């Protein structure tokens, strides 16, 4: 596990606890990288997921762990809502077959909203759909 300045792993997968080789994670790692800007030149080309402070790595580790265990009770306890038959997306992408259809529905909805107003394109970090709720 090689790190640069004790802050960013050369291989982002060293910062990931579960399902390290998932294609969604690889896509995110390839898309969101450090670039030369003067302050962080030493990290140029490395994935943001490799940062020890990466909220996206934290998000992946938590939500993917819950999904793999099929146990969203920590989320249910936090938001006081029962999540029956939960399906999850991270960064609007399905990381398993259960959530594939949800990815297309959410993507279509976002395309109808984004681009019609100034500002950054929407990319929710976490979307969870159950039989009765969309979070």
Residue ranges and their predicted role:
Residues 1-135:
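Charged, terminal alpha-helix-loop-beta segments
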């Amino acid at each position: 596990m090689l790190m640069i300045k004790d802050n960013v792993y050369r291989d982002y997968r060293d910062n990931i606890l579960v399902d390290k080789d998932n294609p969604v994670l690889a896509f995110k790692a390839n898309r969101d990288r450090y670039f030369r800007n003067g302050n962080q030149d030493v990290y140029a080309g490395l994935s943001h997921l490799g940062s020890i402070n990466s909220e996206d790595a934290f998000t992946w580790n938590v939500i993917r762990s819950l999904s793999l265990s099929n146990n969203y009770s920590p989320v249910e306890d936090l938001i006081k809502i029962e999540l029956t038959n939960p399906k999850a997306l991270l960064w609007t992408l399905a990381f398993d077959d259960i959530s594939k259809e949800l990815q297309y529905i959410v993507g279509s909805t976002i395309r109808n909203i984004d681009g019609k107003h100034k500002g950054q394109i929407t990319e929710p970090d976490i979307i969870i759909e159950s039989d009765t709720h969309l979070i």
